[in-house]
C-alpha cells in the first residue's frame, strides 16, 4: 500500500496542509505537492523545495520552514495515487484533476478543501459518471485564514479548524452504514496535527457547517475585494455589518427553500440563524482573521480569476435552479467581477 499523500494545488490552503502534514514524524517524506508544470516545479526547487509559513497569531515566532517534494503530471512515476487532497480553485478543479485520472481508482481517497460549494458534485459527476469506478470522496471545510506573501511563502493569519466528512454515494439518501463509516488513514493523519484542529463528522452535519462557511465567505470575500481592504478593517464598520446582514438573510432563505436535508433539521435551524451568522461573520471573519487578506481580494490584486462563482454565485445558481432570485448575492458577485476587470484595465493601461 502506498500511503503517500499528494496535494493538488499549492496555494495558501494547500501549502498550509502540506506544511502541517510534512511536519509530522509519522508522515516523514510522504507528502508530494502536485504543481502545474515543469517550470513551476523548477521554481519551487530554486526555493530549495521549501515552504515557509509565518504564524501571524503567534508573537516572536520566526519563519517556519519545511522541505517538501514537488512533482507535475509528466514527472510522476507511480502506478497509482491512493491519497489526494485537492485545494485548487473551484473553477480549475476539473482540468487539474483530469490530468491524474490514470492514477486514480475506486480504491483512492480524495479530500476536497476549497472555497465555495458545488464544484465537487459537478467534477465527480463528469470525471466518474459510473458510480462503481468513483474514488472515496471526502469534503473538508476549513476556517484557518492564510494568504500568500511571496512565492511559496505564506502568512497563517487566523487560527481556525478543519471539518471533514465522507461524502455519501447519494447525499439525498444517506444509508446508516455510510453515516457510521470511520475515516481513512489520510484523514487520521490530518487529525494528528494539533494546529489544524480537525473534526470528523457525518455528512448532514458537515453540510450545515459548509453552508455556514459559505455565508462567511459570501460576506467577507466580495466586500474585501471590492473595497480593497484586509478583513479587520471591516470590524467596526456599521455599514459593512448592515450589508452582511442583507447577504446572510438572503443566503439562509435560499438554503432552507432549496436544500432538502435542511427540512425539519434542528441543527440547521440553530447554526444557520441570521443573528448567529452575523456574529460569526464579525468574529471569525473580521476579528479572528482580522490580519487576513481574503483569497478573492488577493486574486483581484494579482489579476487572477476569482472563485466568486462558487461563493455568492453558488447561492445565485441554487436560487435560480429552484425558481427563486438572489439579487443581493448577484450584486456582490457582479461587483467583484467589475473590481477584477477594473484592476486588469488599469494594469494594461500602465
From Swiss-Prot:
A Pfam family per the record? ApbA
Signal peptide span: none
Q: Which organism was this protein described from? A: Schizosaccharomyces pombe (strain 972 / ATCC 24843) (Fission yeast)
| Alphabetized Gene3D superfamilies for the sequence | N-(1-d-carboxylethyl)-l-norvaline Dehydrogenase, domain 2, NAD(P)-binding Rossmann-like Domain
List, from the UniProt record, the residues annotated as the active site of this protein: 213 (proton donor)
GO cellular component assignments: cytoplasm; cytosol; mitochondrion; nucleus
* Biological function: Catalyzes the NADPH-dependent reduction of ketopantoate into pantoic acid.
Report disulfide bridges, numbered on this chain. Answer: none
A Gene Ontology biological process term = pantothenate biosynthetic process
Give a GO molecular function annotation for the protein. Answer: 2-dehydropantoate 2-reductase activity
**Protein name, please?**
Probable 2-dehydropantoate 2-reductase
Keyword Membrane found: no
Q: Which reaction does it catalyse?
A: (R)-pantoate + NADP(+) = 2-dehydropantoate + NADPH + H(+)
The metabolic or biological pathway listed in the UniProt record of this protein is:
Cofactor biosynthesis; (R)-pantothenate biosynthesis; (R)-pantoate from 3-methyl-2-oxobutanoate: step 2/2
Amino acid at each position: 500500500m502506498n500511503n503517500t499523500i499528494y496535494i493538488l494545488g499549492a496555494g495558501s490552503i494547500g501549502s498550509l496542509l502540506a506544511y502541517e502534514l510534512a511536519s509530522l514524524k509519522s508522515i516523514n517524506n510522504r507528502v508530494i505537492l502536485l504543481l502545474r508544470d515543469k517550470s513551476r516545479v523548477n521554481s519551487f526547487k530554486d526555493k530549495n523545495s521549501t515552504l515557509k509559513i509565518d504564524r501571524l497569531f503567534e508573537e516572536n515566532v520566526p519563519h517556519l520552514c519545511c522541505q517538501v517534494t514537488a512533482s507535475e503530471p509528466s514527472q510522476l512515476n507511480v502506478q497509482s495515487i491512493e491519497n489526494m487532497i485537492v485545494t485548487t480553485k473551484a473553477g480549475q478543479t476539473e482540468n487539474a484533476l483530469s490530468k491524474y485520472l490514470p492514477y486514480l481508482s475506486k480504491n483512492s481517497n480524495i479530500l476536497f478543501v476549497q472555497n465555495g460549494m458545488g464544484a465537487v458534485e459537478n467534477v465527480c459527476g463528469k470525471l466518474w459518471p459510473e458510480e462503481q469506478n468513483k474514488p472515496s470522496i471526502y469534503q473538508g471545510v476549513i476556517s484557518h485564514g492564510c494568504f500568500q506573501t511571496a512565492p511559496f511563502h505564506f502568512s497563517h493569519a487566523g487560527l481556525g479548524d478543519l471539518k471533514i466528512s465522507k461524502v455519501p454515494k447519494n447525499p439525498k439518501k444517506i444509508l446508516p452504514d455510510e453515516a457510521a463509516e470511520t475515516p481513512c488513514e489520510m484523514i487520521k493523519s490530518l487529525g494528528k496535527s494539533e494546529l489544524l484542529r480537525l473534526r470528523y463528522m457525518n455528512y448532514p452535519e458537515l453540510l450545515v457547517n459548509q453552508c455556514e462557511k459559505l455565508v462567511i465567505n459570501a460576506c467577507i470575500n466580495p466586500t474585501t475585494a471590492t473595497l480593497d481592504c484586509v478583513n479587520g478593517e471591516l470590524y467596526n464598520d456599521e455599514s459593512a455589518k448592515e450589508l452582511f446582514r442583507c447577504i446572510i438573510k438572503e443566503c439562509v432563505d435560499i438554503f432552507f427553500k432549496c436544500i432538502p436535508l435542511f427540512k425539519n433539521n434542528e441543527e440547521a435551524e440553530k447554526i444557520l440563524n441570521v443573528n448567529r451568522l452575523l456574529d460569526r461573520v464579525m468574529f471569525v471573519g473580521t476579528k479572528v482573521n482580522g490580519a487576513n487578506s481574503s483569497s478573492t481580494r488577493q486574486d483581484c490584486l494579482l489579476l487572477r480569476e476569482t472563485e466568486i462563482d462558487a461563493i455568492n454565485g453558488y447561492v445565485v445558481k441554487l436560487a435560480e435552479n429552484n425558481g427563486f432570485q438572489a439579487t443581493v448575492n448577484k450584486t456582490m458577485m457582479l461587483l467583484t467581477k467589475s473590481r477584477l476587470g477594473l484592476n486588469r484595465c488599469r494594469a494594461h493601461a500602465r
